[in-house]
Amino acid sequence: MEPFFIEIYPDKDDERKTISHQGEEFILVLKGELMVVYGRETYYLKAGETIYYNSIVPHYVGAHGDDPAQLLAVTYTP
């Protein structure tokens, strides 16, 4: 498992691309708001909220709104 501190800036709508890869991801939002597209679902997370998912499913993670988001991400790759 690898932990990361990440600051994400908002993307333009046409720059939002989903990715998929082996492994699992856990995200804790520290500041701001985050948009997570996971398969066909979209989740909006605020500071203090978390999400955990299998990263083989196509996903996108980006800041929601006009301000950057700060997060702690922990990834596992077999």
What is each stretch, according to the model?
Residues 46-47, 55-78:
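Ligand-binding loop in jelly-roll beta-barrel domains
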Residues 10-13, 17-23, 68-70, 75-78:
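Generic protein-terminus/edge-of-domain signal
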Residues 2-21, 41-42, 55-58:
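Conserved short histidine dyad/triad with adjacent acidic residue
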Residues 26, 40-44:
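Short, surface-exposed secondary-structure edge patches
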Residues 7-9, 19-36:
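Short, conserved beta-strand element in jelly-roll/cupin
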Residues 2-4, 25, 32, 57, ...:
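A generic structural signal for short beta-strands and their flanking turns/coil linkers
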Residues 27-29, 49, 53:
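Flexible loop/N-cap segments at domain edges
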